[in-house]
Amino acid sequence: AVCSDHVQMCEWRKYKSPMESSLIANDVDQETIDSLMRTVEKNVDLYREYLKLKAKLMNLPKLGNWDIVAPLPNAPDMEFEWEEARREVVESYRSFDDEVGAWVEEMFERRHIDGEVRKGKRSGAFCAPWFSGKSAWILLSFNRKLGDVYTLAHENGHAVHDYLMSRNQKPSNAEIGACIAE
């Protein structure tokens, strides 16, 4: 019923396809979505191989959704110092693009990342854009685990979007579309 209502609404509004309203709302074109889907399809076998290997290592015939993020059995309990995590994250971005790596380094240099674990601070992580400062702020609780390094890298991805957005858009036009938000 919901899908047929949506299709009917799109027909009434003369959209070319049922996706067109979402494309407009997210300021993205069909070509970009098609490219994203081709990239996923091109690489999905690698991800499937990883999942099969993980299931085997976990002694499971098939992974459940909850197993995807579960730690591997007997995996070393690695710990990272803040500076080590910083180096890993910045170098990962630099390996993609030197300029992007420099933006991430700037987040650390400007002390725009609050990773300290302290009493009263909630766990979790988020990145908030700071338009007037042409930057962003990241809040997370860095407990020195590998997952914290991943989270630090992930939130810096949002900061890169915010960095570019604050330099190329007006605040009223700056919302990141759902197709690239995460």
Q: Could you tell me what each predicted segment is?
A:
Residues A1-E182:
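Cation-handling catalytic/transport regions enriched in His/Asp/Glu
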